Amino acid sequence: MSTDNNGGIKRPDGKVNAIDTDYQIGQDNVALKVGPFGLDIHNRVFAISGMAIVLFVVATLTFRQQVEPFFAGLRAWLVSNLDWFFLASGNVFVIVCLVLIVTPLGRVRIGGTEATPDYSYAGWLAMLFAAGMGIGLVFFGVSEPMSHFSSALGGVNIENGVRTDWAPLGGAVGDTDAASALGMAATIYHWALHPWSIYALLALGLAIFSFNKGLPLTMRSIFYPLFGERVWGWVGHIIDILAVVATVFGLATSLGYGASQAATGLNFLFGVPMTDTTQVVLIVVITALALISVVAGLDSGVKRLSEINMILAAMLLFFVIIVGPTMAILTGFFDNIASYITNIPALSMPFEREDVNYSQGWTAFYWAWWISWSPFVGMFIARVSRGRSVREFIICVILIPSTVCVLWMTAFGGTAISQYVNDGYEAVFNAELPLKLFAMLDVMPFAEITSVVGIILVVVFFITSSDSGSLVIDTIAAGGKVDAPTPQRVFWCTFEGLVAIALMLGGGLAAAQAMAVTTGLPFTIVLLVATVSLIKGLMDEPRLSTKAVKKDK
């Protein structure tokens, strides 16, 4: 892949910088020497986002007693007043993806009409498969289906005219089959079409404006059709600052979940005290390991760790399918998809919801969290998807990871529900969220081994997320440079750990959720505007002929 004199990526069809701009990648950067280390940073984006995060960490650690109720109140206010906005936005992203699939815009090719894929179809699909795995699946694979199942089983509860239960929709009082179907549908809703539509749109925007338009691989580039040269000024600075801050807090939320589950697993297996100190030590140790991975580089560090973790995750998944209720899992996979499709209209309704605890406590938080993660996942997907048509890109980016998520939730959540319903195993029903995975594995063969594998999965996902996340953040904070000095990634990796510690000490997972929602709110607006700009940009792109599209297939 070559570049032009502006630093833009040269299109294979000979056209360079489809957008005519004098901007050069890194032209606003400042080169600094800090001791033996050299830095190459976008002055305003790096400085403002870095200072904002430093102030947050210092304030949170200084006023621990005060910030805990503040975070709880902030989260409650945001999700209770703006849940409709998050849900409606999620629906918009899904609809736009469907429109791009069925309209002629789907024939636009990422990289230009003559572009060829950088990776084989199998290799590309494998990377999309990997994108669907992470700390979230390990943490929520058992806990979320069981939570929605138990809430649905309890049915609707109203006190003083206010619904106080957490059941999705109307629940299913005493009917375990109906409660299971509803619980799985409510879970899959959070892990399938909607989140992956968010990732697909942002990834597509980054890919089109980098590979097709020759602009830097940063968030601001997507907005060029709407704001023109102003994206290189404060309009763009604000967009990139929001992207950096949202990504840091989105990652910190995931790291908080990972630390909580790893500490719970160590307590369950080895009696390690479940304290703030334990979780802080875990975050420090795992962040240190992530730093080693950062220094080792992509090929020696995160790539190998990702391969190891994918193998471990696949082994644990197949173990649960084979040792668990195999036929129930295999048939449940299709039944759960059917239940999900049936319940999508009700689950995605943004207004006049009666199940407000579910829609506000789960869905609004999830959408904000996914949106804050979108620069991280989106940039990874964009960088590996050159040469694919828009239609092919969206279908695969949504369907492949969604299928992985549905299979994982069906295997782990379905096994746990079966243990309770068919075997009377109440520990998995009553356990706290971080403990449910280990409670499920505890009554299966080789429990100690699989539980240790579960902890290793969380730890390595923690490391790879932190490493990859620091790369994405650094690319944005370095003005789109993908080869910025390693010390900058070390800086951001360290900051992610510090933010996770601050959130853990300032209110635990509730604080992490509050900040994910808070930073996700402005970035939702950014992503909605980016969607409009993306469509405008796609309309200017040459499209493959119908014959060429059929030939590719």
From Swiss-Prot:
Keyword field: Amino-acid transport, Cell inner membrane, Cell membrane, Membrane, Transmembrane, Transmembrane helix, Transport
GO molecular function terms noted in the UniProt entry: transmembrane transporter activity
Highest rank taxon of the organism: Bacteria
Compartments where located: Cell inner membrane
InterPro entries associated with the record: BCCT_transptr
Pfam family, one: BCCT
Function: Involved in the uptake of osmoprotectants. Can transport glycine betaine, proline and choline.
Name of this chain's protein: Glycine betaine/proline/choline transporter VP1723
Gene source species: Vibrio parahaemolyticus serotype O3:K6 (strain RIMD 2210633)
